[in-house]
Amino acid sequence: MENIKSFARYIFKTLGAGFSERVYHNSLEVLFKKHSVDFVSEQQIPVMFEGQEVGKVRADIVIENKVVIELKRGSSLRDKHTTQCFMYMKLLGINEGIIINFPENDCDEVEFQEICLAQLCNRCGRDSHLASGCYARTHVKGYAL
């Protein structure tokens, strides 16, 4: 996770604020390729219901099938961003995720939110809360309560 954070900080320091999410996304891809990081960009994930595919969602970047990266550009992260990353992780069976928010102003810093599904659930006390559907803010590292 630290390399991912370092890459994001480097991109923001070099480019600055004001660019679209796509520009920051493409910049991360450049660094991942340069450093031989195995990744999939815009990974399509089927959504199944009653054995039928009812739609697809798309994760921004998946690293080595172990970490979901969700990119944002805006003033701050919101609960819906956490829910979105959590959903991708659940559908892919991946335990780690990180949301990266590139701020709108040069004077702000890149914001990170790590999500680890291997942690014990503080709400229900189980470590298999994905199956139970339990989800609380306390599952998220770095979440500003």
Segments from the language model and where they lie:
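Nuclease catalytic cores
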Residues: 1, 17-21, 25, 29
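A short, cysteine/histidine-rich metal-binding "knuckle" motif
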Residues: 122-145
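Nucleic-acid nuclease catalytic cores
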Residues: 72-120
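N-terminal, polar/charged subdomain of small-to-medium soluble alpha/beta proteins
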Residues: 26, 56-58, 62-63, 117-118
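Interdomain/boundary linker segments immediately adjacent to catalytic/signaling cores
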Residues: 1-17
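A short acidic/basic microdomain associated with nuclease active sites
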Residues: 29, 35-51
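Conserved catalytic cores of phosphodiester-cleaving nucleases, focusing on short active-site segments
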Residues: 16, 39, 59-75, 88
